[in-house]
A protein has these predicted regions:
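Anion (oxyanion) recognition and catalysis
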Residues: 33-34, 134-135, 161, 196
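Structural motif
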Residues: 19-23, 71-74, 115-120, 143-147, ...
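A donor-sugar binding/catalytic signature common to diverse glycosyltransferases
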Residues: 171-212
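Short, charged, surface-exposed secondary-structure boundary motifs
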Residues: 49-55, 99-104, 151-153, 177-178, ...
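Nucleotide-activated donor-binding/catalytic signature segment of Leloir-type glycosyltransferases, i.e.
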Residues: 154-170
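Conserved catalytic-core segment of nucleotide-activated headgroup transferases in glycan assembly
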Residues: 90-159
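Active-site and donor-binding regions of nucleotide-sugar-utilizing enzymes
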Residues: 1-95
Length: 212
């Protein structure tokens, strides 16, 4: 990958390279850096203490970390020790989120509970249990994580539907779902923070990973 990307960048005469989830793009970043191309990471997820891909409190260095990091805001910029100087961490915000908030401001809230899945069995079970108990009072919607659509549909989707749970379409706009929903439940998805911007009350299942 490294030699191919280096050749590609050289031919295209790139000046800037934007990446998301930099720890999955290390060869690409290394190739860019070798040519003096400025590398910039856009925040995806929730950088926090204890997350090995972002927290370098130990003082260790990482040569393939991007030159600049554009965060969603000051909280994220200071939430952990990045392996770059503080002046290279820029609180850029989330313009796309703000645009969506305005786009869906006309939508009226429904008695809808959205489960923000990350493929954890406990959330699928939670969705089934809540739907069975409160099906006459609210709609339970299960928003799958993208990787739950990678291959054939998981077997537990059938169980969810049998319990009356609505499963979001793979192309559904999460922000529109938030705009319609009064409540959201999850464990450690960054989407939970985004849901708050739509006035969607947040509940976190107390299980492994919820501390993040």
């Amino acid at each position: 990958m490294y030699p191919l990307m280096r050749l590609f960048f050289k031919l295209k005469k790139l000046k800037l390279l934007f990446v998301v989830v930099s720890h999955t793009r290390e060869a690409t970043i290394a190739a860019a850096k070798s040519l003096g191309i400025t590398t910039i990471e856009l925040q995806h997820g929730s950088p926090a203490r204890g997350k090995l891909n972002y927290d370098y409190t130990s003082g260790s260095k990482k040569r393939t970390f991007p030159d600049l990091f554009l965060s969603f805001g000051d909280y994220w910029s200071s939430n952990c020790k990045f392996p770059i100087d503080k002046d290279k961490i820029i609180s850029f915000g989330n313009p796309y989120l703000y645009k969506k908030i305005n786009s869906y401001s006309h939508i009226v809230k429904e008695d809808r509970l959205v489960i923000i899945s990350q493929g954890t069995p406990i959330l699928a079970k939670f969705a089934r249990d809540i739907s069975k108990q409160f099906s006459k009072k609210l709609t339970v919607e299960y928003k799958p994580h993208p990787f739950e659509f990678y291959e054939q549909e998981p077997d537990y989707f059938i169980e969810l539907r049998n319990a009356g749970v609505v499963i979001s379409d793979r192309h559904a706009d999460l922000y529109e779902i938030f705009a319609r929903s009064r409540w959201q439940v999850g464990i450690f998805s960054t989407a939970l923070y985004e849901g708050l911007y739509f006035g969607t009350a947040c509940f976190v299942v107390n299980t492994i990973g919820s501390e993040n």
